[in-house]
C-alpha cells in the first residue's frame, strides 16, 4: 500500500533521533519564511512529594555531625524550601483568582444596571409612542365624527360623546395592559 504523506515516510527512514532532528531542520531551512512550531511549556503548579512516614537516616547528635551529613541537611532544606514556595504560590494564585472573580462580578453588576436603565428608557419611549399613536387616532376619529355630527341632527351628539369617552377609556386600558405584558416578557428574557 502506498503511503500518501512523504514527510512521515521520510521520518520513518531515520536511523536515530539525531537523523530525525537533522531531517526536520533541513525541511525547516528549505522554507525559511514559514514560522517554525515552537511548543510552549505550560507552567503547572505541582505539589511537592509528601514527607516520608519513616525517616531512616536521622542524624542523632549535632556534635558528631561532620561534613558527611551536610548533604542530608542540604536535601532536607531544599525539600522544605520547595514546600514553602509551593504554599506561597498557591496562596498567590488564590488571591489573584479572588481578585479576578470580584472584578468580573463588579463588571456584571455595572452592565446589568446599564441594561436595566436602557430597558426602562426603551419601555418609556415605547409607551409614549403608543400614547401618541392612540391620541392621534382618537383625534382623527374625533375630527371625522365631528364632521359627521355637524351634518347630522344635534339630538344624538350627547350619546355619541359618551360612546367616545367609553371607547377612549377602553383603548387606554388596552394600552396599559399591553405595556405590562411587554414589561413582563422583557423581564423574563
Curated annotation (Swiss-Prot):
Residues 116-136 have a biased composition (Basic residues). Residues 105-189 are annotated as: Disordered. It comes from the Eukaryota. Residues 105-115, 161-177 have a biased composition (Basic and acidic residues). GO terms for cellular component: nucleolus. GO terms for molecular function: double-stranded RNA binding; protein kinase binding; protein kinase inhibitor activity. Signal peptide: none annotated. Residues 141-151, 178-189 have a biased composition (Acidic residues). This is Uncharacterized protein F37A4.2.
Amino acid at each position: 500500500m502506498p503511503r500518501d504523506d512523504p514527510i512521515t515516510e521520510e521520518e520513518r527512514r531515520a536511523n536515530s533521533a539525531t537523523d530525525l532532528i537533522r531531517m526536520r531542520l533541513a525541511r525547516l531551512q528549505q522554507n525559511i519564511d514559514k514560522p517554525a512550531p515552537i511548543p510552549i511549556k505550560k507552567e503547572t503548579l505541582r505539589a511537592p512529594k509528601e514527607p516520608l512516614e519513616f525517616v531512616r537516616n536521622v542524624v542523632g547528635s549535632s556534635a558528631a555531625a561532620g561534613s558527611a551529613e551536610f548533604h542530608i541537611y542540604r536535601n532536607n532544606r531544599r525539600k522544605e524550601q520547595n514546600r514553602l514556595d509551593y504554599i506561597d504560590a498557591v496562596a498567590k494564585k488564590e488571591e489573584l483568582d479572588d481578585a479576578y472573580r470580584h472584578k468580573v462580578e463588579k463588571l456584571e453588576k455595572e452592565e446589568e444596571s446599564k441594561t436595566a436603565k436602557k430597558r426602562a428608557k426603551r419601555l418609556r419611549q415605547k409607551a409614549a409612542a403608543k400614547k401618541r399613536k392612540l391620541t392621534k387616532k382618537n383625534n382623527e376619529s374625533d375630527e371625522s365624527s365631528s364632521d359627521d355630527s355637524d351634518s347630522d341632527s344635534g339630538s344624538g351628539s350627547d350619546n355619541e360623546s359618551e360612546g367616545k369617552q367609553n371607547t377612549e377609556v377602553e383603548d387606554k386600558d388596552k394600552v396599559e395592559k399591553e405595556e405590562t405584558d411587554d414589561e413582563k416578557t422583557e423581564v423574563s428574557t
